[in-house]
Amino acid sequence: MADSSGSNPQSPGFTEKLKSWLCWSWTYICALWFAMVLTMVYVLRSPLKLQETVNAASVFLNTLTPKFYVALTGTSSLISGLILIFEWWYFRKYGTSFIEQVSVSHLRPLLGGVENSGSAGLFSSVNGDAEPRSNVAECKVWRNPLNLFRGAEYSRYTWVTGKEPLTYYDMNLSAQDHQTFFLGDTQQLRPEDSVMQKAWRERNPQARIRAAYQAIELNRECAAAYVLLAEEEATTITEAERLFKQALKSAGKDTNLVVYIKRRLAMCARKLGRIKEAVKMMRDLMKEFPLLGMLNIHENLLEALLELQAYADVQAVLAKYDDISLPKSATICYTSALLKARAVSDKFSPEAASRRGLSTAEMNAVEAIHRAVEFNPHVPKYLLEMKSLILPPEHILKRGDSEAVAYAFFHLQHWKRAEGALNLLHCTWEGTFRIIPYPLEKGHLFYPYPGCTETADRELLPSFHEVSVYPKKELPFFILFTAGLCSFCAMLAMLTHQFPELMGVFVKAFFSTLFAPLGFFADKMESFMPSCLWHQLTNV
């Protein structure tokens, strides 16, 4: 056993050396084989009647009219144009080149290539140590802590613009959340619970509302039905608050229902301007149910405290939740950056900073901004109003465009209120990308940026919104190649049609120049080798 264990480390090294030697030798064998084929073709040109074939081909080409060349180049331009259109459509939809994907996925394994682990960056920690992190974990979808009310807010947007702000995928996730949260114990379903279970799955809002009223007819104390009516039928926040209070009376001791309803009541108070009341309700909720931290109620609290401009209380909440062991969010990172930027932004000047350098406080603020931008690089474009905002989705993808939309929608006003904070952000946020030149492979303070955010964000955000992509993808080689080929063929077709004789002279000169090295090589071979040897070889 000892011998076998001792020989194992040497085996992989010998195997790798053998493989590299075979690859090296195979390259030269292929080159030698190609040279031998060319030599044999030249030697056997008389038995194979290659000269006669070439002469016949040249006669045929000389008899072709310019119209043939126009048709040929026009057809080539059309085909390459169709390929270009398909490649561009595929790239816009899936973010990759179709030809490149087929080559890597199907042709490369057949040719013996080893696939690079494209997701290797997703498994690397900040220090470069590999960790078993899967794409599913990286692209986990979270409930938006500040999600709007469908009836009182989302529906108003639809009435005004005629556009649907929520996708079916997003609403389907919400339906699953509600079924799990309110009807977790499927073994003891009451009749009204069965009705509500179907109601959450309905796509049509009116069908959901009718099912909620049906559940109330079965049981006047059905809290889940009042929750649905408050979320979807109430057209004002005041009406939604009244229905939530009715639901709270009927919730009894159902912890999930109580937490959900109290949180939404606090959000109603926040939207109606009773901010201190909302803060008190959120604090009480966090004290009463400390184990429900995954609901991210502290993000609601942070936003309300920022509205009160209670920055000391905001810092206290951050000190508790901005911990290395807890999952981060854009709210945590950017609120921390806002507090540090606020302390120096009113006196910050890029010209003065370039002359005297950054002070310690300014350096801390810049580092906090870099940290926030590394976590979610999409947020600054919305805060700086370089991209238009839309209504946030009900679910977000951390570090994705959906989270950036949700954060900026509620926090843009707080950044504007801090004098000079947006100016400091504008001057420094792009410096983050110099720290992390390859964000998909290695991060600086966080894990490498997940490569799956674009696909998930396209499912969460409506189609009329242009999803922000990071890092910005360059056009694949095959799109550029087909564009050049299409343009070149079209130009040749036009020139051949306009100047047929001149293009004919040009084509003949081009091919004469192209085959001149082959003729020179053949003459040298004939002068180098004895004529009797060629005669004997051709008679074999």
Curated annotation (Swiss-Prot):
Tell me the membrane topology, using the record's own terms: Multi-pass membrane protein
The encoding gene is st7l
Q: Know the name of this protein?
A: Suppressor of tumorigenicity 7 protein-like
Annotated TM spans: 24-44, 68-88, 475-495, 502-522
Is Transmembrane among the key words of this record?
yes
Give UniProt keywords alphabetically.
Answer: Membrane, Transmembrane, Transmembrane helix
Q: Would you identify the family this protein belongs to, as annotated? A: Belongs to the ST7 family.
User: Which Pfam families does the entry link to?
Assistant: ST7
What's the chief localization of this chain?
membrane
Cellular component terms (Gene Ontology): membrane
Question: Can you say where in the cell this protein is located?
Answer: Membrane
